[in-house]
Amino acid sequence: MYRRSYVFQARQERYERAQPAGPAAQPGGTAPGLAALQALGERVAVQVQRARALQQRHAGLRRQLDAFQRLGEQPGPEDALARHVEANLQRARDLTAEHARLERQEAEAQRALDEFRSKYENECECQLVLKEMLERLNKEADEALLRNLHLQLEAQFLQADISVAKDRYKKNLLEIQTYITVLQQIVQTAPQVSLVTGMRESGLLMQEKLFTEREVAALQNQLEEGREAVTHLQAQKAELQAQTTALEQAIKHAHECYDEELQLYNEQIENLRKEIEEAERSLERSSYDCRQLAVAQQTLRNELDRYHRIIEIEGSRLSSVFIETPISLITPSHGAPLSLGSSVKDLARAVQDITAAKPRQKALPKSLPKRKEIIAQDKVEETLEDAPLKPPQEPKALQVERKAEGGSQPGAGGGHGVSPTQEGGPEDVPDGGQISKAFGKLCKVVKERVSGHKEPEPEPPTDLFTKGRHVLVTGESSFVDPEFYSSSIPARGGVVISIEEDSMHHDGHVEPSPGQPMPPVENGQGVPQGREGDHSNHQQGTDKNGLRAKEPKDLEEKDDDGKKEAEGSRRPCPVIIPGPDEPSTSHSQTSGSNQGGPVGPASKSSSLLAKGPSKALSIKKVEVVESIEKISTESIQTYEETSVIVETLIGKSKGNKKLGEKSLPDTRA
C-alpha cells in the first residue's frame, strides 16, 4: 500500500520586468547593473532563508528530542511486555514443577505396575500348579474307576462259574441218587444167587458208594471254597464301592474348592487387569501432558523471541524516525512551530496496541510489511497536517516535499528533494483482529487530523477570474480533451475550493504561488503545444533554451519513475529551482503512479511563475481529496485518502490598462 502526499510551497517572484514604467524610464546602461544587483539580493535572501531554515531545523530537532525523551519516560509497551514475560517465566517454572511431579507420579505408577505384574505372574504360576495337580488327581480317579470296573467284571465271571459248578454238581447228585435207587430196586428184586456172589456185589457197591461219597465231599469242599471266594469278592466289591464313593466325594470337593479358588483368582486377575489399564491410561495422559508442556514451553520461547524481535523493530523504527527525519518533515511548511503532543501520544497508543497483539507464526501476506511502513509515514503526515500555515518572508524559494517509500536523493537543478525511507522487515506481525482495531484507531486519528484543518469556503469576489478548469473525472468516462483527466479506479472524494484575497506589497513580499500540474505525458516525450504556448507567453525574460533543455530530461525521469513505481520501487521527486540566471522560472515535476497499482491515481503537478503588473492579488486553493476503498487480504476495510492542494494566484491590474489582465498559468488536477 502506497501513500503519497505532495506539499508544494512556492514564492511569487517580483513583477519588476512586467511593469512598463520601470524598464522604460531607466537608460540602457543601467540594466545589467540592476540585474546584477537583483541577483546579489536574491543570493543574500537565499542565504538568509537557509540560515533561518537551519535554525528552524535545530528547534524542531530539539522539540522532537524532548518529545522522544518524554515518550521514553512514560510507561510504554516495554513494561507491559516485561510483566508479560515475567508472568510467562513464572508459568514456565510452574509447568516445570508440574512436569517433575508428573515424572515422579509416572515412576510410582511404573513401580506399582511392576509389582502388579509380579503378583500376576505368581498367581499365574500357582494356577498352573493347581491345574497340574487337578489333572493328576483326575488321572488317578480314572485309573481307580478302571480297576473297579475290571474287578466287577472278574466278580461277574466268577459268579457265572459258581452257578455253572452248582448246576453241574446238582446234576451229578441227581444222577447218583437215581443210580442208587435203581441199584436198590435191582437188589430187592434179584434172587440171591449165592452168598459169595452177593458178597462180591455188596463189596463192589460199597466201593462205589465210598467213591461216590468221596466225590461228593470233594465237590462240597469245592462248593464251599467257591462260596468263600464269592463272599470274599463281595467284600472286595463293597470295599471298592466305598473307595469309589470316597474318591468321588473327594474329587467333587476338590472341584468345588478349585472352582472357588479359580473364581477368586479370576476376580483378582480382572482387578489387576483393570488397575493395569488405568495405570496405562494415566501413563498415557502423563506422557501427553509432558508433550503438551514441551510444546507450550517451545511456544513460549518462540513468543519471547518474537517479542524481542518486535521490541528491536520498534526501537530501530523509532531511532530511524528520529535520525532519518528530513528537515521538511520536522520544520512546518510555512514556518509555524511544530506540535507533537497529541499526535505522538495517539500514534504511540496505536503502536502499543499493535505490538501488544499476539503474533502469528507463519504465512505472512506480502501487504503487511508495507502496512507497517505506513504507520511511521502517517506520523510524519500528521505532524505536517497539525502545523498551521504561515506566509513566508523571503521570495524565490521553492521546496518540494514528498513523503513516499523510497530512498532520499537530491533533485535535478540544485533543488532539495527529501524522501525518507521507512521499511519494515518481513518479521512476524500481530494477528488480524487486533491489527484491525489498531489500524482503526490510527485511521480515526488521521481522519481527525485531516478533517480538523479544512478551511472554510469564502465567497469568491466578482472582479476575479481564473483561466484554468479543474475537473476530476472518475468512473467509466473517458475524454480526449487534455484539460480532463480520467481515472479507471472507483473513488469517492470531494473538491474544496477556497479563494483568499490579499494585496501585493511593493517591497517584494508576496503570497506563495502553488505549482502548476503538468498534463499526462505519454512515453515521456514532450508536452502539449497549448501548454508550451502558455509557458512561452508567461515566461518573459527567461532563458528558454535552458528550460527546454531541462524539460525533456525531467519528463524522461518522470516516465522512468512511473514505470519503476509500478514495479514497487520508490524514487525521489526531481525538483528544479531557478538559479541566478533564471529568476523568473521555477519548475517542479513529480513522478506519476501507476493507475493499476494499489493506491489509485496520484497527483501530478509543476509550478511555473510569471510576472504581471498587478497590485491586488488573490490565492485560489483547490483541494482535491480522494478516498479509495481497498479490501486487503485480511478482510480489513481501509480508506486511503490522498489530498492535493493546488493554489492558483490570480492577479488583476488596476494601475495600468495597456497590457491588459494577466493571470498565472492554468492548473490542472
Swiss-Prot record:
Residues 583-593 have a biased composition (Polar residues). One of its GO terms (molecular function) is structural constituent of eye lens. This is Filensin. The modification Phosphoserine is found at residues 5, 339, 513. Residues 69-77 are annotated as: Linker 1. Residues 34-68 are annotated as: Coil 1A. Required for the correct formation of lens intermediate filaments as part of a complex composed of BFSP1, BFSP2 and CRYAA. Involved in altering the calcium regulation of MIP water permeability.
